[in-house]
């Protein structure tokens, strides 16, 4: 198992799939990293040479991933809440932020239904 950005990557998977195990790297970014470093995307991570693995580590270290990205996202949400903006208010109340309807279909964001006592 290769360790990149503090994450143990599965060595039996293809390089571009294994890179998506890092928070903040999706399919598109993984493919771009592979093409920039001229790594065939369908080679297994365990078959990768140490030199290429070091280049991969260096390339990923230039991106904002894992803890730094999580911290940045939470700071952005905290900033919206502190500003008192509409989006911050929706975050604080645990409701959908981007204009979705809430009369129906907001169960994921609102959580399970709260029972109203019978009379």
Curated annotation (Swiss-Prot):
InterPro entries: Rbsml_uS13_C (IPR027437), Ribosomal_uS13 (IPR001892), Ribosomal_uS13-like_H2TH (IPR010979), Ribosomal_uS13_bac-type (IPR019980), Ribosomal_uS13_CS (IPR018269). GO terms for molecular function: rRNA binding; structural constituent of ribosome; tRNA binding. It comes from the Bacteria. The keyword Ribosomal protein applies. One of its GO terms (biological process) is translation. Keywords: Ribonucleoprotein, Ribosomal protein, RNA-binding, rRNA-binding, tRNA-binding. GO terms for cellular component: cytosol; small ribosomal subunit. PANTHER family: 30S RIBOSOMAL PROTEIN S13/40S RIBOSOMAL PROTEIN S18, SMALL RIBOSOMAL SUBUNIT PROTEIN US13M. Located at the top of the head of the 30S subunit, it contacts several helices of the 16S rRNA. In the 70S ribosome it contacts the 23S rRNA (bridge B1a) and protein L5 of the 50S subunit (bridge B1b), connecting the 2 subunits; these bridges are implicated in subunit movement. Contacts the tRNAs in the A and P-sites. Belongs to the universal ribosomal protein uS13 family. Part of the 30S ribosomal subunit. Forms a loose heterodimer with protein S19. Forms two bridges to the 50S subunit in the 70S ribosome. This is Small ribosomal subunit protein uS13. It comes from Nitrosomonas europaea (strain ATCC 19718 / CIP 103999 / KCTC 2705 / NBRC 14298). The gene is rpsM.
């Amino acid at each position: 198992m290769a360790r990149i950005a503090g994450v143990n990557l599965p060595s039996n998977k293809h390089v571009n799939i294994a890179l998506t195990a890092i928070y903040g790297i999706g399919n598109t970014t993984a493919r771009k990293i592979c093409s920039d470093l001229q790594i065939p995307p369908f080679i297994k991570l365990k078959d990768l040479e140490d030199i290429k693995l070091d280049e991969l580590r260096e390339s990923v270290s230039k991106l904002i991933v894992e803890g730094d990205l999580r911290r940045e996202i939470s700071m952005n949400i905290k900033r919206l809440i502190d500003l008192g903006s509409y989006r911050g208010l929706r975050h604080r109340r645990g409701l959908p932020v981007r204009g979705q309807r809430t009369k129906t279909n907001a169960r994921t964001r609102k959580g399970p239904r709260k029972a109203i006592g019978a009379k």
